[in-house]
Amino acid sequence: MNRLQDDYDPYAVEEPSDEEPALSSSEDELDVLLHGTPDQKRKLIRECLTGESESSSEDEFEKEMEAELNSTMKTMEDQLSSLGTGSSSGVAKVGGVTEKFYDEIYFDSDSEDEDKTVTKKKKKKQHRIPTNDELLYDPEKDNRDQAWVDAKRRGYHAFGLQRPRQKQQPVPNSDAVLNCPACMTTLCLDCQRHESYKTQYRAMFVMNCSINREEVLRYKNPENRRKRRSAKKMRSNPEDPAEREAEEIYHPVMCTECSTEVAVYDKDEVFHFFNVLASHS
């Protein structure tokens, strides 16, 4: 009984020999080559050729990406620091693009009791002026358009050819700005409204209008009609040339964009608009 206890050692653990893992690993490699997926075969070939596993290559890729990210962040920090230390002219250049900044007076506080020591230590932040693409509109476009319209109207009234030192004349008054009712194209900037028919206008200077001189429109005055009716009772001969001259002759005027008839053109070179959309001048 004592002999059995001496031979038995509970802490003795049989360890596998060094040859068994080699056999198992070689069998695994053979199994991968015969029945493995393309990814497994690729990993196995890489390990055999380079001696590096897939995890080591992934670690190198992560290191490269981290180094690239650090260099990018450093470049951005240098650009921001150059903006902060730039001149107070309100203009900076980043990446070849000139940026503008608001004047500091727009953001100054009105209170004079503010602690000056704090303001000196605190770095003043420059407020960048957004570009037109960022605002999705041009704030100065309306002013440029209005200046163009005023210059056109001054030119109509012979105010455009002035000396530079001469005082600029005020823009002449216009009853409305006329537009095509079909395509909204501007037809006239300077016009006069009819005294009786409020939807009719006359003008001498137009744009985007074409005159159809091949078509003639005749209009007989009411006074001539009365005279002609009384003359028919006295005679039956056709109209004489004098009565034809009393008729008013017009030519139709169309919009050049959509060919909508918008006005008529008389012999005195005056346009009479009757089919238009009028807006405030």
Swiss-Prot record:
Modified residues (Phosphothreonine): T37
GO terms, biological process: negative regulation of transcription elongation by RNA polymerase II; positive regulation of cell population proliferation; positive regulation of transcription elongation by RNA polymerase II
Residues recorded as bearing N-acetylmethionine in the entry: M1
Compartments where located: Cytoplasm; Nucleus
Cellular component terms per the entry's GO annotation: cytoplasm; nuclear speck; nucleus
Ranges of Basic and acidic residues composition bias in the record: 236-245
Organism domain of life: Eukaryota
Keyword tags: Acetylation, Cytoplasm, Nucleus, Phosphoprotein
Composition-biased stretches (Basic residues): 225-235
Modified residues (Phosphoserine): S17, S109, S111
Acidic residues bias locations: 15-27
Family annotation (Pfam families): Eapp_C
Region described as Disordered: 1-27, 222-245
Chain's role: May play an important role in the fine-tuning of both major E2F1 activities, the regulation of the cell-cycle and the induction of apoptosis. Promotes S-phase entry, and inhibits p14(ARP) expression.
Record's subunit section: Interacts with E2F1. The C-terminal half binds the N-terminal of E2F1. Also interacts with E2F2 and E2F3, but not E2F4.
This protein's name: E2F-associated phosphoprotein
Organism: Mus musculus
